[in-house]
Amino acid sequence: MTEKRYLKWYNKVGYGSGDIAGNVVYAFLSSFVMIYLTNTVGLNPGIVGTLIAVSKLLDGVTDIFFGSLIDKTHSKMGKARPWMLYGYIGCAITLVAIFAIPTNLGQFAQYAWFLIAYTLLNAVFYTANNIAYSALTALITKNSAEQVEMGSWRFMFAFATSLLIQSITLGAVTALGGGAAGWRTVAIIYAIIGLLVNTLSVFSVKELPEGELVDTTNKKEIEQDEKYNLVQAAKLLAGNKYYMMICVTYILQQIYGAMISMGTYYATYILGNQNLFGVFSWAVNIPLIIALVFTPTLVAKWNGMYKLNVMSYTLATISRALVAVAGYMGSGNVTLMLLFTAIAALGQGPWQGDMNAAIAACSEYTWLTKHKRVDGTMYSCTSLGVKLGGGLGTAITGWLLAASHFDSALAVQPESCISMLKIMYLVIPFALDAIITFILSRMKVEEANEKLRAAA
């Protein structure tokens, strides 16, 4: 029996474009906040890393809090769309604030400014926006194939935006005056673009009626499904092993991304050409986009996500090992590094494309086992993963830079720093890919749901 389809092509494209807005924030922040703070503002990378880690203490609570709020929201726009729309206004304001730290402030005030703006962006506004955006996967369609297609469109836009930002930002900062003024102007431009695209994405889709989502029109039954407090929500999530697997995987992916962002330092201080960071960005993002184009077809051909995810990430792990080998062979092996980087990205693509569908399957698992609809709360793993993983990754890079005696005033870094940059950019990404591959080999949520439905 063919599943009912709910979406037109323009709904999928409109939804996917929302990650242009998300990556205007995330790609810009994760790729450039550390080098902006150390080389332009003059802050200590170790202290910055510690402040980011302190900020992350709030994230786990706010993720579950906003996910629960979304589940309990009833409005003309639906459950998630209001949070996606209004949350981004705060994202735009705080993004500009982070890249507009006054240079005439005392250093203590600069650290405080960064901590407040960074915490508001991540723990409040980005949380509300991103959880709502991700939850729409389960709120605008019940068709699993469409959910995979939505994920593919979403991450095609995400990686294209990331590629563009990583490729043009340093040049744009220089063209717009350089220094603090250049960074501030670029942040304002990105924030305006993100605000416009996010608004268009919100109004490109409509949520399904709540009765259709839970297969009942009984309002009391719907309300009963939503009766749980914050502690109960946390227990529902913790009791779903597949949610925990996805959450850990998401966090590891974002730490991986933070390490890859060290390419700005690697290209500058080891390869001797900061513009090579943009070339490596192409080697990462173009293969990811190509993989995403074919992900829905491959999922359908292989009757599910499991085999595709495990096999493709195994390829990614092997390729990252070869990137490390080429990197340690010397700076003359840039071509080999680019080749294996591209193959690794190709292997990572399918999981990026079907991840949201996997989360929807996790939500279905909770419904089948606990009889609670927790779509918004379930998608908290996307926001939690991005913020906790990305923040922790950025904090770790700051600590490691400080521990290796990085000095932004030096054109040539000490050998301790060069060795650490190689570990961060070559070794750690390989290790993270290996761990993710192992977790994906255990993530048999589709099979579990089929058994539960058969037993019902």
Region roles according to the model:
Residues 2-456:
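Membrane-embedded alpha-helical bundles of multi-pass transporters/translocases
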